[in-house]
Amino acid sequence: MNVYKRADFWAKKAAAAGYRARSVYKLAALDKKYSLLSRASRVLDLGAAPGSWTQYVLGTAAACTAVCAVDVQPIASDIQDARLQRVQGDLCAADTRARVACNAPFDLILSDAAPRTTGNRTVDTSASACLAAGVCAYVNFLSSDGGLVFKVFQGSEHLAILTHLRAHFGAVCSFKPPASRPRSCELYVVARFFRGTCGK
């Protein structure tokens, strides 16, 4: 199966299942491998639009699990659930973090956010690292032993992020789900068992 047919497979599967995007199967693979949602009663989804990861959490986690979904774009209006709190704003902005803080602490922080790509690997990798830093700015909203999962483009910056997180989490690794395009440089950082306050 070539790259484009494989991508089409995941997109068609997502549409048939009622999910907003094919990326839902990346989270499903992460959850299967790391049991992300097994103990999560409060989840923060950063860069959530159009909403497939939020859909997955609401449909898979325990019935009592609450989700705070953040994006500068509105989350799909037909995703309706009493457990869902929407926060519209730039995830990297201080005022957005202040609004999210009202819902903390979280057992799990998720982010599938990615920068607009230019086709220049160096530029795109750097932009991804900057966005990842914005996601990591929320880490102190985690409860003890909480988890953090986010997308980053592979490169020297991503290795530096892993090194930084290992000082604050009991287990840190990276993973490329089967639903990722084979030629994509995207990886997902999985940090588990938060030890406490993480300095900037």
Curated annotation (Swiss-Prot):
Q: Which reaction does it catalyse?
A: uridine(2552) in 23S rRNA + S-adenosyl-L-methionine = 2'-O-methyluridine(2552) in 23S rRNA + S-adenosyl-L-homocysteine + H(+)
Gene3D superfamilies, from UniProt? Vaccinia Virus protein VP39
Q: Where in the cell is it found?
A: Cytoplasm
Active site positions: 151 (proton acceptor)
Q: Where does S-adenosyl-L-methionine bind?
A: 51, 53, 71, 90, 112
- Pfam families per record: FtsJ
Keyword tRNA processing attached: no
Tell me the function of this protein.
Specifically methylates the uridine in position 2552 of 23S rRNA at the 2'-O position of the ribose in the fully assembled 50S ribosomal subunit.
Q: What is this protein called?
A: Ribosomal RNA large subunit methyltransferase E
Species of provenance: Treponema pallidum (strain Nichols)
Q: Which gene encodes it?
A: rlmE
